[in-house]
């Protein structure tokens, strides 16, 4: 099975949970769009909404807003299985990263530029079917895990 996520343009629905130490898991949902405008160059946009109620005493150490916006711009050479990207994150600012495309997963890591807190992270997208991926993400600060996201990505359009 070849990858349909990232390697093909399309729109995906993400649904899962946000986890942070000392907090109950919180529902997260959103849209992920992949565009290929030029040969070898892709755009990857994520719009995610965090669902927590005011009564839940939600005291995240990381989330200051209930929406996350991530805009990637990346380069994947012809016949290559590795790519690089830059990323604009509405809470973290400017990031850079790289990724690998393996037969059954897409794995990437990123780091926040000019960050004294040494925040970085990784994401794994494991292919379940042609139109479904299991998504796992972790943000670290120094040697500590700050938060994780675990979700299912389902293709909604090509």
Could you describe each region identified by the protein language model?
Residues 2-9, 13-158:
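Soluble ligand-binding/transfer domains with enclosed cavities or grooves
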